[in-house]
């Protein structure tokens, strides 16, 4: 019998690093009975942080998926006749900016999210990045202000920052009773009652007590705001609100909040202290009450690859099967694991699925429900499920899996380009092939990891999203694949750009006895005016000067040539080519001749199109005590930083600047020295900008010098 999707939640837990995501997830697993003891991040025992590097560093690197169950509603933890069992698929995502890809691919397949904020720090830079990603995928969310027990905790400041920094509409559903070491409970604004958690049973039960006198005014103010906010989303409530607000029932308020959350008009805010076991059960109740089930969201849309017609798939087991592979991982015991979100239909274990990217059928050998890195075998999966499958020979992140007779391609996942690289080689020559195999496995798992061979130096260059990202990859090569690696100094992922448009004629001729080679093209080449990436190719040839069958080869030649720019062989990411004239030879012309003419023509023409070197610019935010503001800003200025302003937060300043990545290697260590370890920095990729002429010349000289060695 198909499960009732009304009681299914696919959620993610997202936040800035150190906001308490993994600790909150561990408490959820404890309270839902999936673990019998609480794992602590600082002890390296968190269930969801299962990679060795995660347990050592106390940060989450990969998005671990877990299925758990929660009974709701209950009274003091006891079931009633109205209690239902909810199935909750939780994806715990990393907060470090280098692992944004894990957040991106998780949000693509979620129905709702819990956004965690630290009561002390409020909205931090990575919170803003993740919030924007959730907006992009239209993921409804509820907010949880964590760490209310910490010195400097300020619930109302956090709510204010959610509004001002994220442009959200936060509506508190609770008001904290006390803060810092006096935090002991909350006032539930919907039921208008105070709740104090019992420490004896780790917060499993609570006492309902009178609302403290000193909070009554604040409670009245925020309850009024809550009523006003939800009344706007329901005409019946609005009428009741104006006539007699006291007639509005708890159930009506909750239904209105749910409606407003699902259409992303509001973000309810709860609070607690996960580490002290306070507030997590109410958060689980809120997940069940306010976040959508697969049935509450519009059917997923896609395209039929054969007809290119738009199609939809409803979350129903009777619809044709459709799933999206959102993560590939390698398990030492079962091999390649493909994590999937099933949008429609049903799939039994040991059956075949059709991969719309490869155009091939593959047999799944096993289906599994995941609990961090442990697998529980299951017989089948159906609409709404998040699970893992074993048996794929060729699978990539973003692949759509269907049955062969009902094809559909769902919107894939777009990942950012890497900005930093290291040259790598094995310490032992005998390990060259082993390294190649290991790297191809890691690249399969991580779409933001790129590996390429520098044609001129012969070096293998591994590129990623930041120093920590690549450090962890090299660590994995050592631990998982037993490889010893030599790595070069960090390399910036420079790019090249054309800044003027020129016309060029290229004639490619080769005569070696017998049939020769001939192609003649005249084209305009320059920067795109629309600011988009890639090649914008237009064919303006009339009268058959070049036969139509050769045009795709010309386009292919230009697209391939963009990989090596004219100055220092860095890629040209964006350009336009207008093919305006040319000629061909009846016998000697073929597709390859025209492709080569385009490649050679690009090389010659690009030199004359005012090429420049582009460098990645990072948005840097440094949180520092007031007394170090001067040294911090001075240091950023020395690094060619452009200041974007400062925000005061108590006795600290948040210094914001845009700084070229090339000036930031080892910055975190230097910052520690400047501020005696009292400042923290986040570096987020912002954009590419032109390198100043003098520096560009030295970059080109350096590349040419390396190539000539």
Swiss-Prot record:
Family, as annotated: Belongs to the TRAFAC class translation factor GTPase superfamily. Classic translation factor GTPase family. EF-G/EF-2 subfamily.
CDD domains on file: EF-G, EFG_III, EFG_mtEFG1_IV, EFG_mtEFG_C, EFG_mtEFG_II
HAMAP family, per the entry: EF_G_EF_2_B
Gene Ontology annotations for the cellular component aspect, listed alphabetically: cytoplasm
InterPro entries according to UniProt: EFG_II, EFG_III, EFG_III/V, EFG_IV, EFG_V, EFG_V-like, EFTu-like_2, G_TR_CS
Keyword Iron attached: no
GO process annotations (BP): ribosome disassembly
Protein name: Elongation factor G
Principal subcellular localization: cytoplasm
Organism: Amoebophilus asiaticus (strain 5a2)
tr-type G domain location: 6-295
Residues that bind GTP: 15-22, 92-96, 146-149
Pfam families xrefs: EFG_C, EFG_III, EFG_IV, GTP_EFTU, GTP_EFTU_D2
Protein localization: Cytoplasm
Record keywords, A-Z: Cytoplasm, Elongation factor, GTP-binding, Nucleotide-binding, Protein biosynthesis
Function per UniProt: Catalyzes the GTP-dependent ribosomal translocation step during translation elongation. During this step, the ribosome changes from the pre-translocational (PRE) to the post-translocational (POST) state as the newly formed A-site-bound peptidyl-tRNA and P-site-bound deacylated tRNA move to the P and E sites, respectively. Catalyzes the coordinated movement of the two tRNA molecules, the mRNA and conformational changes in the ribosome.
GO molecular function: GTP binding; GTPase activity; translation elongation factor activity
